[in-house]
Amino acid sequence: MDNAILKIGDIIESKAGRDKNRYYIVMKIDEPYIWTCDGDLHKVDKIKKKKIKHTKYVGYQSEYVKNKLEYGEKVTNSEIRRALKEFVESKEEGSCDDAKR
């Protein structure tokens, strides 16, 4: 899938840099950059600016995080970590129920 159609709440994987192979959730989009968060190294109050071309869309989205951001509600670091943990666990099992595209 083309990274040009990334949306808020999408889960991406870093393809370059020190954080290569790390998962993030897209918090904000301003092409050619996205602002991402993992709730651990890059927390909600200090989101990471990343070039879109250095990321890979993994095909899933956190509906919970997306909905909170769309309604202007605050997302916590623990909610981000939980969403990413659920994605990784479901990926290992072979399916992800949060939201497929």
Where are these regions (language model features)?
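Ferredoxin-like alpha/beta domains used as RNA- or RNAP-binding modules
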Residues: 1-8, 27-101
